[in-house]
């Protein structure tokens, strides 16, 4: 009997040690709620620093925009120059083809002019034939005029190697030195472009005899 009593006492002591003690709380005492602390940033953002950062970003974007715009303007200018150059080259090529074709026609005009100067048709039939090919010559000249082809007026003009081809040079009493005194073959131009140089005879000025004769004709100092 005494053994059972001691065992019961030990069990009660163990149970009492396992259960934590609960403090006495009065019914009227309020219990403080548990408040969780919110973590805060160690450093707050400074408005001035943020404004400076935005200004730097804006300046960077402006520089990028200016660089892209400058590149675009260069490309646009290069393309415009390329387009103009292509148009100019095409126009030059077209003008060269037209001038080349017109130059091939000029010998035909020369033949018509030689025939008109050398032939003296006699008889009604010959005159009718003469009028017929002269009509063709007039049509050909009119076509050349419509294409802007014009004859050069060279006699009495100063010799210009860009317009004239000097075939002969001789002394001439009527023209000074380096003046065209005779046209041997007509020259033609079109819109400032030479189709064919004029073959000319250029004056070398009065000869030495003419100069001495002119000097002898002047009154001497003793003559009066």
Curated annotation (Swiss-Prot):
GO terms for molecular function: adenyl-nucleotide exchange factor activity; protein homodimerization activity; protein-folding chaperone binding; unfolded protein binding. Coiled coil: none annotated. GO terms for cellular component: cytoplasm. Gene3D superfamilies: 3.90.20.20, Head domain of nucleotide exchange factor GrpE (2.30.22.10). One of its GO terms (biological process) is protein folding. Residues 1-16, 209-224 have a biased composition (Polar residues). Keywords: Chaperone, Cytoplasm, Stress response. It holds the Pfam family GrpE. Residues 1-35, 203-224 are annotated as: Disordered. It comes from the Bacteria. The keyword Cytoplasm applies. It is found in: Cytoplasm. Its main location: cytoplasm. InterPro entries: GrpE, GrpE_coiled_coil, GrpE_head. Homodimer. Belongs to the GrpE family. Participates actively in the response to hyperosmotic and heat shock by preventing the aggregation of stress-denatured proteins, in association with DnaK and GrpE. It is the nucleotide exchange factor for DnaK and may function as a thermosensor. Unfolded proteins bind initially to DnaJ; upon interaction with the DnaJ-bound protein, DnaK hydrolyzes its bound ATP, resulting in the formation of a stable complex. GrpE releases ADP from DnaK; ATP binding to DnaK triggers the release of the substrate protein, thus completing the reaction cycle. This is Protein GrpE. It comes from Synechococcus sp. (strain CC9902). The lineage of its organism: Bacteria, Bacillati, Cyanobacteriota, Cyanophyceae, Synechococcales.
């Amino acid at each position: 009997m005494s053994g059972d009593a001691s065992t019961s006492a030990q069990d009660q002591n163990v149970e009492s040690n396992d259960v934590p003690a609960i403090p006495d709380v009065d019914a009227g005492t309020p219990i403080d709620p548990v408040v969780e602390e919110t973590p805060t940033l160690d450093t707050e953002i400074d408005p001035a620093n943020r404004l400076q950062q935005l200004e730097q970003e804006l300046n960077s974007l402006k520089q990028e925009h200016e660089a892209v715009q400058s590149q675009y303007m260069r490309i646009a200018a290069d393309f415009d120059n390329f387009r103009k150059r292509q148009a100019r080259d095409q126009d030059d090529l077209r003008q060269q083809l037209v001038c080349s074709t017109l130059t091939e026609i000029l010998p035909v005009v020369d033949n018509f002019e030689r025939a008109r100067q050398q032939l003296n048709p006699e008889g009604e039939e010959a005159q009718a034939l003469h009028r017929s090919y002269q009509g063709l010559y007039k049509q050909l000249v009119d076509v050349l005029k419509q294409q802007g082809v014009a004859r050069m007026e060279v006699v009495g003009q100063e010799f210009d190697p860009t317009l004239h081809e000097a075939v002969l040079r001789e002394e001439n009493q009527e023209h000074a030195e380096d003046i065209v005194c005779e046209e041997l073959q007509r020259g033609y131009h079109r819109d400032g472009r030479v189709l064919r140089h004029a073959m000319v005879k250029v004056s070398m000025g009065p000869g030495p005899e003419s100069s001495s004769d002119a000097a002898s004709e002047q009154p001497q100092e003793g003559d009066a």
